[in-house]
Amino acid sequence: MRDMNDLKSELYDQLLNELPVLRARLGITQEVLALKVGCSRQTVNAVEKRKKEMTWQLFMAIIAVFNLDESTRKMLSDIPGFSEKLNMVLNEEIDR
């Protein structure tokens, strides 16, 4: 069984690699994303530039925003292994 922290780190990296493109697809700024997920624009900027670590709560909030739109939901599902890793982590969290 893979370490859940390693899986989360891989998920964070995969999301961060695509975050500017996902935001562009929705036509939203860092500020708008921040309002939607309940944090500051500075936090989104720092996380996107990898100057600050992403929390699991922020990760899930961002996923929720992009899951609402069909095109960005498809983009997330097209990231190799992303859905599988996310399901593994979520199933582990539920089983605790």
Give the location of each predicted region.
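Short basic helix-loop element that most often maps to the first helix and adjoining turn
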Residues: 17-33, 61, 93-96
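DNA major-groove recognition helix of helix-turn-helix/homeodomain DNA-binding modules
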Residues: 57-78
